[in-house]
């Protein structure tokens, strides 16, 4: 009788252990599933962040002097296009950050957009409305016709020139603008996705009025 009671007790303990193990396994499996889903979601978000964003095609500078060697870069045009995985980028939320190592400037969208023919980019009338600390937009290619003044949207296949003045921010030897042999770094920062990187050094001498800087 006593042996039977011990056997039943052992069986009860064994069943309890099995139940506890089953519950623990269920918790572990549930937690693992949750963590896997969370990791997948984070991976998708990271992939989207890396794939989307702005790509800088070229950076051009303009020197309003004759000969150019006597002047400084007073205007800049940054040609951009979206990265391959980008959804629409609202350019009204974009910030342009530039630094020459002495000062750092942040440019915001001016609300001015140009969609006509571009025969002389640095002499368009749009520059009259491009003031201190702002950038305007000249549309080079608008595939989906989503470019409008208030919320110009940059989509796959589009190219625009972001136009800004440098003579009201930077200075070289008493003259407004960016001088020769000057290191410039910066970014074109969208509200979501990767920023376009600006990184160039101006030539030691300016031989032309329009220079390709990057």
From Swiss-Prot:
It comes from the Archaea. It holds the Pfam family Arch_flagellin. The keyword Disulfide bond does not apply. GO terms for molecular function: structural molecule activity. Transmembrane segments: none annotated. One of its GO terms (biological process) is archaeal or bacterial-type flagellum-dependent cell motility. GO terms for cellular component: archaeal-type flagellum. It is found in: Archaeal flagellum. Keywords: Archaeal flagellum. InterPro entries: Flagellin/pilin_N_arc, Flagellin_arc. Its main location: other. Residues 1-4 form a propeptide. Flagellin is the subunit protein which polymerizes to form the filaments of archaeal flagella. Belongs to the archaeal flagellin family. This is Flagellin B4.
């Amino acid at each position: 009788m006593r042996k039977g009671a011990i056997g039943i007790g052992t069986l009860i303990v064994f069943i309890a252990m099995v139940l506890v193990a089953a519950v623990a396994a269920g918790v572990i499996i549930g937690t693992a599933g949750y963590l896997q889903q969370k990791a997948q979601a984070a991976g998708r978000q990271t992939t989207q962040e890396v794939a989307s964003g702005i790509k800088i095609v070229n950076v051009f500078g303009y020197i309003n002097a004759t000969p150019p060697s006597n002047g400084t870069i007073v205007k800049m045009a940054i040609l951009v296009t979206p990265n391959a995985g980008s959804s629409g980028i609202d350019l009204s939320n974009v910030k342009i950050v530039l630094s020459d190592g002495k000062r750092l400037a942040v440019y915001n969208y001016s609300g001015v957009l140009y969609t006509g023919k571009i025969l002389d980019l640095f002499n368009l009338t749009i520059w009259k409305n491009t003031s201190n600390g702002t950038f305007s937009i000249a549309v080079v290619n608008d595939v989906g016709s989503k470019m409008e003044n208030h919320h110009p949207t940059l989509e796959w296949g589009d190219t625009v020139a972001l136009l800004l003045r440098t003579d009201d921010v930077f200075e070289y030897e008493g003259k407004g603008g960016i001088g020769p042999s000057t290191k410039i770094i910066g970014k074109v920062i969208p509200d979501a996705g990767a920023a376009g990187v600006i990184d160039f050094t101006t030539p030691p001498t300016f031989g032309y009025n329009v220079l390709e800087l990057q």
